[in-house]
């Protein structure tokens, strides 16, 4: 048996790591199922603090500046699951406060993605719908000495923030109200003035060093046109919208961790209700970029076919690749809600998908990199295959003459004189083989099922 073991080991060691992985998954996928992850996916998410049945309101707030991907799916699934867990409500809110980035096609793509995931919001709205209300809260914050108008250039602002120093605009309280009227009435243009939060320039949390709350963007907005040029940043719009929308539990990715202090302070100054803020980690895959920043160059440089390329983790790409919404949901829930940065393999998502589609899928034979085998002395034969090994999905017939194709990986193990069985067909013995040209000749031997010869898939 040792010569055989040695032969197998030599073949395996000659393969690249990726080829070994493909071979392992293709032949022994069931044995590799992540049992613990599957069990965990069937349990509920951990309970929320200060949550009452029937009163929980969550929100999914994507910016319509790109196509939705698996990271958006994670956030959407989690907030919907919590809304369902507490018999509450889910708001889909487009945080569309940057006219330079927002496009109608992205609103539509996000809606299509949410629909495909079988997520049904109780309310759909745009932050831009409340732009004048946000202006009124901006004025109120200035009146309460919680913000001021800054006319410094960007370089000065950056330098002073890094040094923890205040600019003259913050100190010039006499002109704050006058400048406030000017900025809300359209007196200033792009880069001439911004509204900044009056925080703590000495804070170790740099997010509290007078961040920008409003800036001027002189560009047409896809929803409201050119009516407005003074637009709130996410730092200002998010807490206001969450509070007035009745959101009880606001889920934010870990990247906003330092900005949660600002979130709460803005609401406290304005005497608005403060939602519970829950942080969770973003979703990234091992060896697969997820963020738009990393995917965009691949699309622009035409390294992929577009945003729906099945190699990408966009929802359009995952759909084209054959993933089901339920597999994505189970995968997300298996990860749970945690701050720890993990990069699961996409093979885990694939395993969830296999489990779901197993009972729905016909079994077909497939060979990657075909190797041609011409068979001598074999009578034409009609082979009948079951479309599923255990379920009634019918049959298919294949008429075989004297040519079949096997996988190049299987062909690498063959040599002259070796007998193999073509699954559900018959046995053949190799009489000639050229591995470089990917072709060979074999003799038909018999139809007997033998235990000691390898069984190979063919088409």
Mark where each language-model region is:
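Glycine- and acidic
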Residues: 58-65, 91-97, 243-251, 309-315, ...
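Hydrophobic, mid-to-C-terminal alpha-helical segments
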Residues: 265, 297, 330-356
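Active-site cores that bind ATP or allylic diphosphates and position pyrophosphate for catalysis
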Residues: 144-295, 303, 352-353, 358-362, ...
């Amino acid at each position: 048996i040792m010569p055989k073991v040695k032969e197998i080991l030599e073949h395996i060691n000659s393969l690249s790591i990726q080829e070994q992985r493909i071979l392992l998954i293709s032949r022994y996928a069931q044995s590799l199922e992540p049992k613990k992850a599957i069990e965990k996916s069937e349990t509920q998410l951990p309970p929320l603090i200060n949550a009452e049945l029937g009163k929980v309101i969550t929100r999914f707030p994507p910016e319509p500046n790109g196509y939705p991907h698996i990271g958006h799916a994670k956030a959407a699934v989690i907030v919907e699951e919590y809304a369902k867990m507490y018999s509450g409500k889910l708001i889909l809110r487009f945080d569309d406060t940057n006219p330079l980035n927002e496009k109608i096609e992205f609103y539509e793509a996000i809606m299509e993605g949410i629909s495909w995931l079988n997520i049904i919001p109780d309310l759909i709205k745009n932050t831009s719908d409340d732009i004048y209300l946000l202006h009124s809260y901006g004025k109120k914050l200035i009146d309460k000495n919680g913000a001021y108008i800054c006319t410094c250039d960007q370089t000065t602002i950056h330098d002073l923030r890094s040094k923890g120093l205040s600019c003259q605009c913050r100190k010039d309280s006499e002109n704050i109200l006058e400048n406030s009227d000017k900025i809300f009435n359209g007196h200033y243009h792009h880069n001439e003035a911004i509204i900044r939060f009056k925080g703590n320039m000495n804070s170790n949390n740099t997010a509290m060093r007078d961040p920008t709350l409003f800036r001027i963007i002189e560009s047409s907005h896809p929803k409201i046109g050119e009516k407005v040029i003074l637009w709130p940043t996410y730092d200002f719009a998010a807490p206001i919208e969450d509070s007035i929308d009745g959101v009880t539990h606001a889920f934010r990715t870990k990247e906003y961790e330092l900005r949660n202090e600002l979130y709460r302070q803005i609401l406290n100054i304005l005497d608005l209700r403060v939602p519970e803020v829950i942080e969770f980690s973003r979703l990234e895959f091992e060896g697969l970029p997820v963020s738009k920043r990393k995917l965009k160059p691949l699309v622009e440089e035409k390294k992929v076919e577009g945003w729906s390329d099945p190699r990408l983790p966009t929802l359009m790409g995952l759909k084209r690749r054959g993933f089901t919404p339920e597999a994505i949901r189970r995968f997300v829930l298996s990860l749970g809600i945690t701050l720890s940065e993990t990069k699961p393999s996409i093979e885990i998502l694939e395993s969830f998908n296999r489990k779901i589609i197993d009972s729905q899928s016909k079994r077909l034979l497939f060979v990657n990199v075909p190797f041609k085998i011409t068979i001598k002395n074999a009578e034409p034969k009609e082979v009948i295959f079951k479309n599923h090994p255990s379920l009634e999905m019918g049959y298919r017939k294949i008429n075989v003459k004297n040519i079949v194709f096997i996988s190049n990986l299987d062909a690498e193990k063959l040599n002259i004189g070796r007998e193999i069985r073509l699954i559900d067909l018959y046995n053949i013995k190799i009489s000639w083989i050229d591995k470089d040209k990917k072709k060979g000749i074999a003799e038909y031997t018999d139809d007997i099922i033998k235990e000691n010869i390898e069984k190979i898939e063919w088409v």
